[in-house]
Design a protein with these regions (language model features):
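Bacterial N-terminal signal peptides that target proteins for export
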Residues: 1-8
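Bacterial N-terminal signal peptides
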Residues: 8-16
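Extracytoplasmic/secretory-pathway proteins
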Residues: 21-224, 230, 234-242, 248-392, ...
Length: 862
């Protein structure tokens, strides 16, 4: 019976191991030493000019900022703030959003209350949601509520809060803002019975309501009338809003010819406004930029390059976005055009081989391939007329109608219908009942109500501003020869593309630019692409020696000079250069200093030097996709507390638990550590004798000695090297005295088999153990039975994905450090091969436990 029970327990352990095998991976919090595309955190440092070592992989939206610093310029505080906002949106995959308008709405609601007093039921749009904010969509901007609040303040000051006309004004404004949710609501037209101020205000309120309800024809007509009334306080505003209305109208049109005509009319209107000295001149210029973006993108990208390169303007944030999106658009068009050309030539080759079609015909097709259409308007979207099982999809009747999708309460049927933009809820219900053929239930009415509101919101958001047309996902690589000429005419655009392209073409062009300009910008670009035998390399290296260390270009130039010296075998020169940089007071970004340290580690002549220079400092940590400091994570998690979410804990108890959970991680906030590349070198090139020497090195901080001791002991045991295991055991016990009893079982074992089983039992009971050095923060949890993703170890991967070929390829052995002998490296690789054969911990220990239970059924440990 005991045998059966123990076998069942052993089997349970195996299943537990296998369950744990699937998610083998790193711990949840991992150090960040370098970003591929973004600046290091905090972004404010890069925006302020601390650009460090630039990389071609950094996105253009980042390199744009570097360009101005490399040319001796800088950014104002407002521009730096704009840069950080754009980067936060770009790299957190969040939409570009304007300021939250909730506080402005609150002010308006409070001001309104001073007139209407206490209401039994205020308008729904003024009811704050449980989770904060108001249910407005972006058509009603922050400025709309600021204007309403200021105007009401003025009217109260002039006429008093109890004045019947002021109260009527507020009711009319409520009607205007109803359009911010959906549907069409218009206040009563002005009449002669109203005082003159009220007539002027009401005319504007009517036009504004039409604008917000997307009735652009009526809005344009009424704004134009107000613009001709020079006695109206809204004359300047209305004149500007005529252009705004036309832009909105054009953005909704799918008719390209009509769209361009409307944009042209808007451009004429806004040009007149921009030429005047009025409070809307700057706003008009912003709108003119949007029109150029849509009608003449080639012209706009050149204009933006010249603005951004030197001084910027009041629209700097949007200029950055538009410029970056246009570059992405033109790059995509160039690469797709190249794809098409290659496809046609491949067809020609196929025909030539098969003689299936006259080659001249295909050559003609290649010649007729369309030019990159940089000025194309918005593509026409087809209307979906498909019909699917248990679904009914109505054909769209009128351009601009809102698409509504609803479903039956049992989810077995769905219907798609279209309603006019200005339809009310009741009109939408009636249309839905006609399409469905029966009355709507209350739940279905709520579906229609919400779907109409979301469709209304989406109709505006989809056409509010420039549209992103970039994003190339094919296999072509960009080269300078593929770019159209207009992208080479402005220095900023020319540099951005040149810095990012790879290969000798980019080097030779950058070299020619440096010869012409003798600038740090083009020296940096050329030397970053140079190889050890590149043309005129000596000229670049000599120029690199003369760069002022305080120049923004210096870190990148120095890094690549060191790289080239290393490639040329001039290790002493490279070592001296790197030591000078690392020992200087140069204020480098953490990630840039890490790159210099990594170079210096490769030149180490001793093990101690290697361990010293290979230690890097993370600039931030990643926790489930969020980057920040450990303190940031603690603060974030503390903010999650609410009495409703944690009814059994006080805030103090909850925060104490958070502190306890992060106790180990907090220790690593300012520590240096080895990155994954260095750990890989050690695991594959350091045999046990070298690892023993490394563990004793004074170059290692105390917290890393523990990691080496545990890995050495575990590796030695798995390789049946119990002599080495005995040597390192005292170090293991220094850090983990709780293992003394289990270690004694090993030491006092009378036979080799007993020793192996005692060692296996110790490993089994301590999931922190692995024969491989761990990178990152290592393992803090050593609780057996509480399985984590990083318990014990996973077998090293023997293949990896190659992005160039799109195939799995053999993992390449990292270069051997120069202080190691070939014999030492070979010994390490032999050990590594044996560990690979052992495989994952779950498989290995599961098999050993089963074998143990079979051979020693009375052993109480299994």
């Amino acid at each position: 019976m005991k045998v059966i029970i123990r076998f069942a327990v052993s089997t349970f352990l195996i299943f537990a191991f296998f369950a744990n095998a699937l998610p083998c991976g790193p711990s949840y919090i991992t150090p960040l030493f370098e970003y591929e595309h973004a600046p290091e955190n905090p972004y404010e440092n890069f925006a302020a000019g601390k650009i460090g070592i630039l990389q071609p992989s950094q996105r253009r939206i980042v390199l744009i900022a570097a360009y101005r610093y490399l040319n001796g310029g800088g950014f104002s505080d407002a521009e730096q703030k704009a840069l950080v906002e754009v980067w936060n949106a770009e790299f957190n995959n969040q939409p570009y959003e304007e300021e939250n308008i909730s506080e402005t709405v609150k002010k308006w609601v409070e001001k309104r209350r001073s007139v209407v007093g206490k209401e039994e039921k205020p308008p729904e749009i003024y009811v704050e949601r449980e989770y904060g904010g108001y249910d407005f969509f972006p058509n009603c901007t922050k400025n709309a509520f600021e204007t309403a609040e200021k105007t009401l303040s003025d009217r109260i000051a002039s006429h008093g809060s109890d004045d019947k006309d002021v109260k009527d004004w507020v009711k009319a404004q409520d009607t205007v803002f109803e359009n911010c949710a959906s549907g069409k609501a218009t206040p009563g037209a002005p009449n002669e019975a109203m005082p003159e101020w009220m007539q002027k205000d009401r005319a504007y309120q009517v036009a504004a309501a039409e604008f917000y309800s997307l009735d652009y024809d009526s809005a344009k007509q009424h704004f134009a009338q107000i613009a001709q009334d020079y006695n109206s306080p809204w004359q300047e505003t209305a004149e500007y809003l005529v252009g705004r209305t036309l832009i909105r109208q054009a953005s909704l049109s799918k008719d390209k010819v009509k769209q361009q005509l409307i944009y042209t009319e808007a451009e004429q209107n806004l040009s007149n406004v921009a030429a005047k000295s009025s409070k809307f001149s700057d706003s008009a210029r912003k709108m003119l930029g949007l029109i150029k973006y849509r009608l003449r993108p080639q012209e706009r990208v050149r204009e933006l390059a010249q603005i951004i390169a030197t001084q910027g303007d009041g629209n700097f944030r949007q200029d950055l976005i538009d410029y970056n999106w246009l570059l992405d658009k033109f790059e995509k068009e160039s690469l797709e055009a190249e794809e098409k050309r290659k496809e046609e030539f491949n067809k020609i080759n196929d025909v030539a081989n098969s003689n299936a079609e006259p080659i001249n015909s295909l050559l003609s097709n290649v010649a007729k391939l369309p030019e990159t259409d940089a000025n194309s308007a918005v593509n026409e979207l087809p209307v979906n007329r498909a019909r699917t099982t248990n679904s009914s999809i109505e054909t769209q009747q009128t351009e601009g109608d809102l698409k509504i999708e609803i479903y039956s309460e049992d989810y077995k049927e769905t219907w798609t219908l279209y309603i006019p933009v200005n339809a009310t809820d009741e009109e939408a219900f009636a249309k839905a009942e006609t399409v469905i053929g029966k009355p709507l239930t209350d739940k279905m009415k709520e579906q229609v109500r919400l779907a109409r509101k979301e469709a209304y919101r989406g109709r505006f958001e989809a056409n509010n501003g420039a549209e992103y047309e970039g994003g190339y996902y094919g296999s072509e690589s960009l080269s300078l020869s593929l770019l159209p000429d207009y992208l080479r005419l402005d220095d900023l655009t020319n540099w951005l593309f040149t810095f990012q392209v790879q290969g000798n073409e980019g080097y030779l062009y950058a070299l020619s630019q440096y010869r012409q300009t003798n600038s740090n910008l083009w020296l940096l670009t050329a030397i970053s692409k140079a190889e050890k035998s590149s043309t005129d390399l000596s000229r670049l290296l000599e120029a690199a020696d003369k760069i002022d260390r305080n120049a923004a270009a210096y870190p990148t130039i120095a890094y690549h000079k060191a790289r080239i010296l290393m490639e040329q075998g001039k290790t002493a020169e490279a070592r001296k250069l790197l030591d000078d940089i690392l020992n200087s007071g140069l204020d480098l970004p953490i990630s840039s200093r890490n790159k210099f340290l990594a170079q210096r580690a490769k030149l180490s002549e001793t093990l101690d030097d290697y361990l010293k220079f290979a230690q890097l400092r993370p600039f931030a940590f990643d926790w489930d996709g969020t980057s920040g400091t450990i303190e940031d994570f603690i603060k974030q998690q503390k903010s999650w507390y609410t009495p409703e979410s944690y009814p059994n804990q006080t805030r103090e108890e909850y925060e104490k638990e958070v502190e306890e959970n992060f106790k180990n991680e907090r220790l690593w906030q300012d520590r240096t550590m080895f990155d994954g590349a260095t750990i890989n070198v050690m695991n594959q090139h350091f045999p046990l004798p070298v690892l023993l020497e490394a563990e004793k090195s004074p170059a290692l901080p105390e917290y890393l000695h523990e990691r080496f001791a545990l890995a050495i002991w575990t590796r030695a045991v798995l390789l049946n090297d119990f002599a080495t295991a005995a040597k390192i055991a005292p170090e293991v016990l220094k850090f983990h005295p709780e293992l003394q009893e289990l270690m004694d079982k090993i030491n006092f074992a009378k036979t080799p088999l007993a020793k192996k089983r005692a060692a296996l039992f110790l490993i089994l009971k301590n999931p922190m153990l692995s024969p491989f050095l761990e990178d990152g923060l290592g393992k803090a949890d050593n609780e057996f039975g509480n399985f984590d993703a990083n318990d014990w170890w996973c077998a090293p991967y023997e293949t990896e994905y190659d992005e160039t070929t799109g195939k799995e390829v053999d993992v390449k052995l990292p270069p051997r450090p120069m202080f190691l002998t070939a014999a030492q490296s070979n010994a390490a690789q032999a050990e590594h091969k044996k560990l690979v054969a052992i495989g994952d911990a779950p498989n290995f220990m599961g098999e050993k436990v089963l074998e143990w239970a079979r051979l020693a059924p009375t052993d109480k440990r299994v």
